[in-house]
Regions:
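Low-complexity, intrinsically disordered export/secretion signals at extreme N-termini
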Residues: 2-72
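Acidic/histidine-rich, metal-coordinating catalytic segments
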Residues: 304-319
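Short, low-complexity, polybasic intrinsically disordered segments
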Residues: 317-329
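N-terminal pre-domains immediately preceding structured catalytic cores
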Residues: 45-46, 50, 56-105
Length: 329
């Protein structure tokens, strides 16, 4: 979740994955570079190793998503949700290894009688512990689940309760290019509060899922301001990025599909040119595996179509790299 373009579990007063964009041919400085010619000699071994060790892209998952045809997940849910709205399953923990309870009453709000969608976030915090600390603050906001970098899933709020994890809604018809002429004119006024209010009055399916009817899933991951980046391309058509942050960190992104790479270049530009705009680190393989399992189970439990699962920046105005590398299909 983001504030001023950066995700934050501690402050979400105006709590966006960019919609899937067409894939223009990148040009100029942002064009992908061959793996054999990194621009900085000191990083050549790192970039070469990234290309050599690259795992194949997630084409199989994309095919599975197409086969699913946006329908509700089939089969029975394994979650076994109790009367408190807590999941009783060995893969979903209610305590940390140190014995700390993860259900955080201070982020729970009113009763949530119906679940219509899932929203995927990144925390902009370095650990489970720091996220739980923020959830313990007075007036804290947060999501229902938290997935650590090693793939461990924690439940942090009752599934019977709303949490403030979405923020102001973006116009769904604007992103799907289906607005009426009147609504197109209203959206051009750039009034996020008014836009969100109009959206909230629409029926399910005509608007994005909101705080009132969605489950939030957070992935532990930091966001950093980009200073520069290099790219390599793999034989399978995927891309690797090496981003240098303004505080000297090196962030690696491996096996990004062509469309994600295009969007990542856009996010890097934004981070370089705008204050308080950062790029989120790549979601880990373990997190994505757990995310796929959890979203499948939740979709089965609540009969949620695949078309109602979104990364946070799609539904609200957030940094576009938040959950950009998340894989739930």
């Amino acid at each position: 979740m983001a504030m001023n373009g950066i995700s934050s579990t501690a402050s979400r007063s105006s709590l966006q994955s960019l919609p899937d964009a067409p894939q223009p041919q990148p040009t100029g400085a942002d064009s992908p570079q061959p793996a054999s010619s990194p621009s900085t000699p000191g990083n050549s071994q790192t970039l070469t190793r990234m290309a050599r060790d690259a795992r194949p892209p997630l084409a199989g998952q994309q095919q599975a998503a197409a086969a699913n045809a946006k329908g509700a997940a089939t089969g029975a849910s394994q979650l076994n949700i109790d009367d408190k709205g807590h999941v009783q399953h060995e893969r979903v923990l209610l305590k940390t290894a140190a014995g700390r309870e993860t259900i955080s009453p201070k982020i729970e709000r009113m009763e949530m009688p119906k679940v219509n969608g899932l929203i995927i976030h990144q925390t902009n915090s370095p650990s489970v512990s720091s996220t739980l600390n923020s959830y313990a603050l007075k007036g804290a906001n947060g999501a229902h689940f938290l997935i650590d970098k090693d793939g461990t899933i924690y439940q942090t709020a009752s599934l019977k309760r709303k949490t403030n994890h979405v923020g102001r809604l973006r116009s769904r018809c604007a992103q799907e290019e289906s607005c009426s002429p009147q609504e197109m004119k209203l959206n051009q006024k750039h009034d996020p509060e008014g836009e969100s209010l109009r959206e909230s009055k629409k029926p399910v399916g005509d608007r994005f899922p909101s705080n009132s009817d969605s489950i939030g899933i957070e992935l532990v991951g930091m966001a950093y301001k980009a200073k520069s980046h290099q790219e390599t391309s793999n034989l399978d058509g995927s891309f690797n990025f090496l981003i240098t942050t303004t505080d000297g960190k090196m962030l690696k992104y491996e096996n990004l599909s062509a469309d994600v790479a295009i969007r990542m270049r856009e996010e890097i530009k934004e981070s370089k040119n705008k204050d308080n705009y950062s790029v989120f680190e790549q979601v880990t393989l373990q997190q994505n595996e757990s995310l796929r399992w959890l979203t499948q189970q939740l979709r089965r439990e609540y009969s949620i179509p695949e078309s109602e699962v979104f990364a946070h920046p799609t539904v609200s105005r957030k940094a576009g790299s938040e959950a950009l590398t998340a894989q739930w299909r």
